[in-house]
Amino acid sequence: AKEIRKLKKDAQITMISADEQVHSRCMLHKYLSHERTAEELSFVEEDFFEKNQIAEVYGHIEVIDTANQMVDTKGGESICYDKLLISTGADSFIPPVGDLRKAKNVFGLRHLKDAQEIDKMAEDAEKILIIGSGLVGLDAAYGLIERGKKVTVVEMAEQILPVQLDAHAAKTYQELFEQAGVQFYLGCKAEGAVCEADGMIRAVTLDTGKQL
């Protein structure tokens, strides 16, 4: 939006976001570790929208009407456009395993609100299980071990950070996390998880038969 404003001085720019405030997704683990507040995750000035003459709309898009060049938000607002730029990026993925997707204490980590929910739940949690040892999973592990939590990571590949690192570098990172108390289960995946009566999952079964 900032670059478009530089190119189009007189254009009417509206930015619609599901996030209530601008924040760096790459720093969400710092929120989990309590090293930064929500406000300290922002990477723009307080007057960014006003200074760049950008209208900010909080909400979700439900309908994109390309014929009439209009979008409808979940809140019932209709916004017209000449050009529509969709830059939503990726999203967190919760595996369709057992009751993982409906449990009250299972979260992805993509938005600030996700980090806030994890932070709240972590207050009373001692043991935390993370499925996936990619960048986001290990960032979350860092944030939570900084809080003194006992963290276990499950990864279906034979090494951590399988997309980013070779086996030698991955082993080095793994050893550093293990020195901080993280336990890894590699080359296996979650196979079962059942919600208890209160909607919480307290154990996950791996395809090896191991229950965590």
List each language-model region with its residue ranges.
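Beta1-alpha1 glycine-rich phosphate/pyrophosphate-binding loop at the start
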Residues: A1-A55, G143-Q164, H168
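A general structural signal for well-ordered alpha-helical segments in protein cores
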Residues: R25, H29, I94, A115, ...
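FAD-binding core/adjacent interface of flavoenzyme oxidoreductases
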Residues: E45-L129, G187-C188, G192, A203-Q211
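Rossmann-like NAD(P)H-binding beta-loop-alpha module
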Residues: E117-L165, I201
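Glycine/Thr-rich phosphate-binding loops of Rossmann-like dinucleotide-binding domains
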Residues: H23-S24, Y81, I94-P95, L138-D139, ...
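A Rossmann-like FAD-binding core segment of flavoenzymes
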Residues: D10-Q12, N52, E56-D72, I79, ...
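Surface-exposed, flexible loop/turn segments at secondary-structure boundaries
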Residues: Q21, S92-F93, D114, V136, ...
